[in-house]
């Protein structure tokens, strides 16, 4: 049996218990399942109240039901939504009835979205945008995901693909109808001009790809420094909750502690690390090793010090700010050594809050510069970048092979069009689909 001959069902709303739960069904037998549960079919796309019953006539729950006949539905199939009370007992009873119904089965993760993709309701870039929207933690991530979900990248790729196919058709028509075998200049010149313009557009998108991808992944800030310098206190201040143990005893933090922050809409992961020092304790040694490793791979290191920063360790080329802590404990302004290798210096008291505003403002400014103008970023995933890179390379080869024969030019354009088709998920991507849609939750 083909998977689409089966009707799937899943809880599409949040964790139970809840005030309302939404159960979604999709497939050829969704309507029959609704008829069985509600006793009658509601009008399409009209909110209808119904008492759901099991096959023995026992009430399950009072519900609001919606019926979306194919193809005018989210998945392109017959779709039913059951809005019921978010009780674990109600859901268990309903799922028991559905599971015992022939040709109905529980949905796999992402299966509703995959069916929508396979039925042409959205392309692969829009499906990835939906996944990004589900996992968005900040407003800027939400806006970026919505742009992709609405087809900003997909529409542009479709237009590029159509223009490449048109250019290839012009060249192939010239080959087919030319007595000498050479494409007439009046056909070749406009085709190559169009290819050159497309190449410039695609290269511009590739040049800006890092911004959107960085916004999706977020900025990593590591808090490092010697033991008892106030790292965990700063971590708690930034998180605005107790996420790290604060103790006057040195070496309290042995492992990495991560917290996700939203700084002016920018996603930031802050990592508290073990105090860096020489030690004979093997557990603490491992903590120090991990601290140095994360600092080397961070986007920014905040090096905390009670003193003048003489003990600063800089890992690689990672930007480093010196943050002098506990300024409320010394009455005089402390000088900073000129050879600390820190690009910026701040003085704070995490306990009193002095200096925290300036540090936060600086972090927001760093994030703004790090992410750049994300409005122009379209590529959020490595898969998308690779497909566009393959397209641009094929277009460049088509321009470079003009003197070797128009057949080679047309072949390179065909390769470019295929790469864009893979980006949209329309050709040669079957192996990717399971990987992509497994990232979705069940019920989506």
From Swiss-Prot:
Quaternary structure per UniProt?
Answer: Homodimer. Heterotetramer of two MnmE and two MnmG subunits.
Cellular component terms (Gene Ontology): cytoplasm
Enumerate the Gene Ontology biological process terms. Answer: tRNA methylation; tRNA wobble uridine modification
Cofactor notes: Binds 1 potassium ion per subunit.
Which residues of the sequence carry a binding annotation for GTP? 228-233, 247-253, 272-275, 349-351
Protein name per UniProt: tRNA modification GTPase MnmE
Would the keyword tRNA processing be found if you checked this record's keyword annotation? yes
Is Oxidoreductase among this UniProt entry's keywords? Answer: no
Q: What's a Pfam family in this record?
A: MMR_HSR1
The terms under GO molecular function for this entry are: GTP binding; GTPase activity; metal ion binding
List the InterPro entries: G_TrmE, GTP-bd, GTP-bd_TrmE_N, GTPase_MnmE, MnmE_dom2, MnmE_helical, P-loop_NTPase, Small_GTP-bd
Where does the record place the TrmE-type G domain? 218-368
Tell me the keywords, alphabetical order.
Cytoplasm, GTP-binding, Hydrolase, Magnesium, Metal-binding, Nucleotide-binding, Potassium, tRNA processing
Binding-site positions, Mg(2+): 232, 253
- Give the family this protein belongs to, as stated in its UniProt record: Belongs to the TRAFAC class TrmE-Era-EngA-EngB-Septin-like GTPase superfamily. TrmE GTPase family.
Q: Which CDD domains match?
A: trmE, TrmE_N
What residues bind (6S)-5-formyl-5,6,7,8-tetrahydrofolate, as annotated? 24, 81, 121, 444
Cofactor annotation:
K(+)
This enzyme's EC code(s): 3.6.-.-
Can you say where in the cell this protein is located?
Cytoplasm
Q: What does this protein do?
A: Exhibits a very high intrinsic GTPase hydrolysis rate. Involved in the addition of a carboxymethylaminomethyl (cmnm) group at the wobble position (U34) of certain tRNAs, forming tRNA-cmnm(5)s(2)U34.
